[in-house]
A protein has these predicted regions:
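A cross-family phosphate/adenosyl-ligand binding-site feature
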Residues: 2-411
Length: 411
């Protein structure tokens, strides 16, 4: 899977040696992670997975089963993790160390069965038993042929794992196999598992992308928005342990990994209706981020297709409902962050308009942007304006995301 957004997050951090990695975030900084590699063919993905863990600053300990060594060498995994690999019993007994989380990838049915039945015939199995005893988060990544996965015994084993408090991450069937998810997806899931224990984690709804409205049966008008900023914020907050609901319009950029709760609403009406549905959830969001480019003006579409011709076609656009205003009665007490995009105005005018939006809708903050500056690396990524009149420059996406997280977590 491509990673179109990574350079903008940490642009000034580079590799300094052959085993080095580009740092993309700090979601696993100072976290001790055990990666247990069992003997599935997906063990070949261990190099990529180890390096992805390190991109988020995890301290990675690797254990490999004897079967895994038949598929990939400890030397390759040691290079990827920049650490020694435990392949057999030794006096250091790393399997009894304390870890912030354990990943079993790939998790063969044999390994899952042994863990459930308490068999400790290898360092990996002892480490898993100790982790369960310490209530350490464990993430299993089953990978096997579809026929084996569909065996009722396998399904029972997975159900037992979940009932014991472990988490299981599955990829959709591909080539009649349940393959291992991408390293990006696995590490994002792990970040969420580890960081959800941090204080003040919240359910956060974020609108993103553009609205489109028809003017006849084949033509439409649409705001300019790729959805990039919304996806970046969503991924960051998910990694930080928040429960994220994405309300998505029309986008040209896609997330780097599947987020767990994505709901769609491309037109202004359908996006607002989806927002109403989210606000009415049994457990409603405690925070809202209004990052979508909502279509403020649109029309009732003409019937059929207007015939092509040389004459002018005059249309009348009428103002639509303001989503932030319409949602207000349903989200009282929630943290709310708006976005303000302007063009051709001074910095002070932009800030004044952002502060006006805060005052008008009772927002906790507004991220203010100049259209001419959004994609220009010579300008900051935005400015955050607060109700007290303070303004803070946001130089990078990483700083923008961290500021949004701070507002949500500390309000």
């Amino acid at each position: 899977m491509r990673r179109p957004l990574e350079v903008k997050l940490c642009p000034n951090i580079y590799m300094v040696k052959d085993t080095g990695v580009k740092i993309l975030g700090s979601s696993l900084k100072n976290r001790n992670i055990l990666l247990a590699i069992s003997g599935g063919i997906a063990a070949t993905e261990s190099v990529k997975l180890s390096r992805e863990l390190r991109r988020y600053q995890a301290d990675v300990t690797i254990m490999m089963s004897k079967e895994a060594e038949k598929i990939i060498t400890p030397l390759a995994v040691s290079w990827a993790s920049d650490n020694e690999v435990v392949t057999d019993w030794n006096s250091k007994m790393h399997q009894l160390d304390s870890y912030d989380a354990v990943i079993v990838a790939p998790a063969t049915r044999n390994t899952i069965s042994k863990h459930i039945h308490g068999i400790m015939d290898s360092p990996i199995m002892m480490a898993l038993s100790a982790a369960r005893g310490k209530d350490t988060p464990i993430l299993f990544i089953p990978s096997m042929h579809k026929d084996l996965f569909d065996d009722p015994v396998t399904q029972d084993l997975i159900s037992i794992l979940i009932s014991q408090g472990s988490e299981v991450l599955l990829e959709e069937e591909n080539e009649n196999k349940i393959k291992q998810p991408s390293p990006l997806h696995i590490v994002a899931k792990l970040c969420n598992m580890v960081n959800k224990k941090l204080p003040n984690r919240k359910k956060v709804a974020i609108t993103l992308g553009a609205n489109r409205a028809p003017i006849d049966a084949v033509r439409a008008i649409q705001n300019a928005s790729s959805g990039q900023t919304g996806w970046i914020i969503s991924e960051y907050l998910y990694r930080q342990g928040h429960d994220i609901v994405c309300i998505v319009g029309k986008t040209t950029v896609h997330p780097n990994f599947p987020l767990p709760d994505v709901r769609f609403g491309g037109s202004p009406e359908s996006m607002l209706s989806t927002c109403f549905g989210v606000a009415s959830d049994k457990i409603p969001p405690e925070a809202w981020i209004h990052a979508a480019a909502v279509l403020d003006y649109y029309m009732h579409p003409e019937d059929g297709k207007k015939s092509s011709g040389s004459e002018n076609w005059e249309i009348t656009l009428s103002p639509g409902p303001k989503h932030i205003l319409e949602l207000s009665p349903l989200v009282k007490g929630s943290i709310r962050i708006g976005f303000k995009l302007e063009t051709g105005v001074s910095d002070q005018d932009l800030i004044d308009k952002a502060f006006e939006q805060i005052s008008k809708y009772g927002l906790d903050a507004v991220i203010a942007n100049m259209k001419e500056q959004v994609h220009d690396p010579n300008f900051p990524r935005g400015r955050v304006v607060r109700p007290d009149g303070s303004v803070k420059l946001l130089e990078t996406y990483e700083i923008l995301c961290a500021e949004v997280d701070s507002i949500i977590s500390n309000s």
